[in-house]
Regions:
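Residues immediately within or flanking Cys/His clusters that coordinate Zn2+
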Residues: 161
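Soluble non-cytosolic domains of exported or imported proteins
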Residues: 167-170
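Cell wall/extracellular polymer interaction/catalysis modules
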Residues: 1-158, 172-181
Length: 182
């Protein structure tokens, strides 16, 4: 877990941040989830769970709640050096993608939050294991950018992400899925 990023996420006023960006913030209805991925801006080196996924919602008692999960919002070294697509590895472009995901199955194996509508990705195809966020490579479409789990307690991204948003451990993922089912 990136403790500095975790601490910043713990103190952030996401409703204000999202509204200031012109995004929607869901503050009505119970368990109307705001799922927010925060990318570590410290470096562009691959293979660490150094990002966080924040989930904010109103719980069953009407109380605003927040969970913060260790995650990666970027591909692992395996996909960066050997991209699945000839166009290069997909890296989700920051932005709000409302209703772009739904409950489904990740690679047909287990329930996850799966891409349902188009999103934008950068394409990184130089196979150097350093993220390139080049606006000239942006592509929009459905690429299977899912929100899923890594191993039980993974410390390296490796093969867990080819562009997906991946929670580092199973317990956090189970919590996210319980929230998504409410």
């Amino acid at each position: 877990m990136n403790k500095e990023l975790f601490n910043k996420a713990s103190k952030a006023d996401f409703s204000k941040i999202l509204i200031n960006k012109g995004y929607a913030y869901f503050n009505k209805g119970k368990y109307n989830l705001n799922i927010i991925g925060i990318r570590n801006a410290g470096n562009n080196v691959t293979n660490k769970f150094d990002d966080v996924i924040v989930v904010e919602y109103i719980d069953m008692y009407g109380i605003k709640s927040r969970n913060i999960f260790a995650a990666t919002t970027e591909p692992g070294i395996t996909s960066m050096t050997k991209p699945v697509s000839y166009k290069g590895c997909a890296i989700l472009v920051p932005g709000q993608y409302r209703s772009a995901w739904k409950l489904g199955y990740h690679k047909g194996k287990y329930e996850a939050i799966v891409q349902y509508k188009p999103v934008k990705v950068y394409r990184d195809n130089n196979k150097d294991a350093i993220y390139d966020f080049n606006p000239k490579t942006i592509e929009e479409g459905t690429f299977g950018i899912n929100i899923h789990k890594a191993g039980t307690h993974s410390t390296q991204v490796n093969n867990w992400s080819a562009g997906c948003q991946v929670l580092a451990n199973k317990e956090d993922f189970d919590t996210l899925m319980k929230l998504a089912h409410r």
